[in-house]
Amino acid sequence: MKKPYRKISDYAIVGGLSALVMVSIVGCKSNADDKPKEQSSLSQSVQKGAFVILEEQKDKSYKVVEEYPSSRTHIVVRDLQGNERVLSNEEIQKLIKEEEAKIDNGTSKLIQPNNGGGGSNESSGFGLGSAILGSAAGAILGSYIGNKLFNNPNYQQNAQRTYKSPQAYQRSQNSFSKSAPSASSMGGASKGQSGFFGSSRPTSSPAVSSGTRGFNS
């Protein structure tokens, strides 16, 4: 049986979440007349989606193992036995709401120093909600809570830890960079911040199809 991640090519490669980093550094090098066009292009890219595969770990936490731009957002959960299923929109929204409550009361792993603290269900890793918000999909689905994570230094570090490995994170960055507007046309790109909430605030949350520094050692 073919797994969903082997059929990623079926989805249009159009996202562009790494463009969030670019938009924050558009400065004097950009022509004033080009800015409206650039902003429009970025806005359209951000409002697209991401195909994300989350893998269950032995401690019942979850990690991002694959992530690609997509015409719509799909989140696939793979359990310890290798079984996969696509989260429904209702499941995703419930998980994000639960994680938002943790962010509000300071117990979310995403904002804990050194990835510490949090609830007992996330004793040594990230739960589904925090893994989703740490991924590219989180910048789309959780855009309305971006202000709560924006410029949070702990989030900047922990967001990358939601990825299974540095290689998984780099594949994601490369994938989204390829689908984003070219850096040369926007005065270059900054790599000073990590996490998809790190440099801009998406303003809308598109429909879900039912279907960054330092890693854990």
Curated annotation (Swiss-Prot):
Residues 1-27 form the signal peptide. A lipid is attached at C28 (N-palmitoyl cysteine). A lipid is attached at C28 (S-diacylglycerol cysteine). Residues 172-210 have a biased composition (Low complexity). Keywords: Cell membrane, Lipoprotein, Membrane, Palmitate, Signal. It is a lipid-anchor. It is found in: Cell membrane. NCBIfam families: PRK04081.1 (NF003146). HAMAP family: UPF0323. This is UPF0323 lipoprotein HPSH_01205.
